[in-house]
Structures are given as C-alpha cells and as structure tokens.
A protein has these predicted regions:
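A conserved mid-domain beta-alpha-beta active-site/ligand-binding segment of alpha/beta enzyme cores
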Residues: 133-209
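Short acidic, hydrophobic short linear motifs in intrinsically disordered regions
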Residues: 212-223, 232
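C-terminal engagement modules used by replication, chromatin/transcription, nuclear envelope/ESCRT
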Residues: 246-326
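A short acidic (Asp/Glu
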Residues: 14-18, 37-38, 95-103, 126-131
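Charge-enriched amphipathic alpha-helical scaffolds
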Residues: 223-257
Length: 326
C-alpha cells in the first residue's frame, strides 16, 4: 500500500515531488474563496458547480476541469488503498478552505486513522527542494475532534446565508491554528457596511490613490497588505477588472476586461499589466466612505454558499467584527 500526499496546488505539488517525498502527490487546485460553493446532496453535484465556475472556455474548458476534479476526488473514494494520507497545507484562506473540505470528505468516508496534517506558517511552493521537507517536523495525526470541527466549518461556509460562518469565526478550534483568521478574512470579502467594498477592492483603490497605478506592481502591493496572502494573479486581475468594467466604474485605464487568455498572449499581457490606472470621481467618493458602491452598481457574486445580490446584500462591519444585513 502507498501513501497519498494532498496539497494546495501545482507549485507545491511539484516541489514536494522534486524533494523526493514518499507518496503519490495530488494538488487540490480549487479556488474555493471564489464563486459558488453551495450545499449539494453529493460531491458530484458540487464538482459540477465548481467546474462551471472555474472554466473560462479557452484556457480551462469545463469538461477538462470536471475531469480533473473527479480524478482528484477519486483518490479520497479509494482512501482504503493508502495506508497513510498526508495533508500539506498553508496558513492562508486559499489553503484553509481546501483543508476543511478535504477533512470533511475524509470524515464522510469514515477515514479516521493514519491521516496526518502538516500546516506550514508560510508558503510551501516558495521553498526549495532541499528544505521544504523540514515542515514535516510540524506533522501531527488528525483527531476525531478535528474531523468533526472541519465538517462543521465546511458546512457553515456552504450555507445560503453567512450567519453560521460568522459564528465559526469566533472559534479557534484545536488543531487549526490558522482557521479562525482565515474565516474572518473570508468574511471581509463581503461588502463593507458603509462603502459596499470587499476588503480586496478597498485595498486596490487605496493603493491606486497612493500612486501604485499599474496592475503588475499593484498586485504585489495588495498582496503585501495581507496578513496571509491568498490571491493568485487570475483572482486579483478579475477583481481589478470588475472595478473598471462595472456599470459605474471606480477605476479607469485598464486596456480590456480580464480573462485568463490575456496572460497567454505576450502583447495583451504587457499592455494589461502596464496600463495606467486612475480613480474615477465615484471611486474617490467610495474610497472616502461617503458613497456606497452598491447604490450605483449591481452586486452579483458568491461567498461560499451565500449568493450576494443587491436584494440579498449581506455586509461585514470590520470595526464591530459582525454581519450587517440591510
């Protein structure tokens, strides 16, 4: 029998393979802090929803994404074929959501023995092959209580309203030193109580207002404003593009609406990441907190199982650490 190694994405998976880790390495890949992650009766139904969101039709086709997700989950269905399962994950939101999903799935499959967790306080994919395995000294066995807690957090994330998730953000469950902060960071992507902006959107406007006007350096600046950076370039540029292409833009100057194919073409990519951005008058007012983004633009996005629209607009009050539902 062999070992199964699950980690966040391709960079970490490739590095662990290069380091010679003993086992079959599988990247999880899903960007769970983006798009719908609703309650579903089966894992297959959730895969179908996620494939529909993750596919862009050019760089990633839906059938390919669905096949990759199914192949990934098949390793958990066949967990009895592995005498040992290791989970190698990081401290940020991207990883912590993947971690609670995997543990919830393992618990549902009654895998309660020989599951081990490594939670790195930094980024696995940015290490070197000759030092990444040092994180194994952080390894410990997953307990029954951890499986239960992970399932509860995962279920809360998928609820159609965020109240349960906000309650979970008050809890620091044993064995998950980074989960509470990650869940709070997820809630900060809800529209703000007064300005209607997600934290990432607010950080973008703040940085442009202070002279970081090109998308490439802006991406680096916004990541540096995070306690634990979790956004990839596709995620960031999609949010940036939304601020430029909404009905009443907060930013101007972007060369085109972002889609993943932009980064596959050298000419388009260079023009996109070197564009000169500037706040519109509305952008300055929203940043100042005197105008609400949602009063001028449509809201249509997801946080886990919560579909945010102008009619169902859950907000997050960062000062009070609580939800606000107007």
């Amino acid at each position: 029998m062999s070992h199964l190694i699950l980690t966040n994405g391709d960079s970490a998976a490739g590095l662990l393979r290069e380091a010679g880790i003993d086992g079959h390495v599988v990247p999880w890949r899903d960007v769970l802090h983006e798009g719908p992650v609703p309650e579903t009766a089966t894992d297959a139904e959730l895969r179908d929803v996620r494939a529909g969101y993750l596919a862009d039709g050019t760089v990633r086709r839906r059938d390919d994404v669905l096949r990759d997700l199914a192949a990934r989950d098949a390793h958990l269905d066949a967990h009895q074929d592995y005498e040992r399962i290791e989970l190698w994950f990081e401290h940020d939101l991207y990883d912590q959501l993947q971690l609670i999903q995997i543990l919830s799935m393992l618990g549902a499959r009654d895998r309660r023995q020989d599951v081990f967790l490594v939670q790195a306080p930094t980024y696995i994919g940015m290490q070197k092959p000759d030092n990444v395995l040092r994180f194994r000294e952080l390894e410990f066995a997953v307990t029954e209580a951890m499986l239960i807690n992970a399932s509860e957090f995962w279920a809360a994330f998928r609820k159609p309203t965020p109240e349960a998730l906000a309650e979970k953000a008050k809890i620091a469950p044993e064995g998950f030193p980074f989960l509470r902060q990650a869940i709070k960071r997820a809630l900060q992507e809800l529209p703000g109580r007064t300005d209607g902006l997600a934290r990432t959107e607010r950080q973008i406007l703040y940085s442009v207002d202070r002279g970081i006007a090109k998308p490439g350096p802006l991406f680096a600046r916004v990541l540096n404003m995070e306690e634990a950076a979790f956004l990839g370039d596709w995620s960031f540029f999609r949010i940036l593009s939304g601020l430029c292409t909404c009905s009443c833009p907060l930013l101007e100057g972007l060369t085109e609406h972002f889609e993943p194919s932009v980064l596959q073409d050298d000419t388009r990519r260079k023009a996109f990441i070197t564009a000169d951005l500037a706040l519109t008058d509305l952008g300055r007012d929203v940043l100042a907190g005197t105008v609400d983004f949602a009063e001028h633009n449509d809201v249509d996005r997801w946080l886990g199982g919560t579909h945010l629209t102008n009619d169902t607009l859950w907000r997050w009050d960062d000062d009070a650490d609580e939800l606000d539902h107007l």
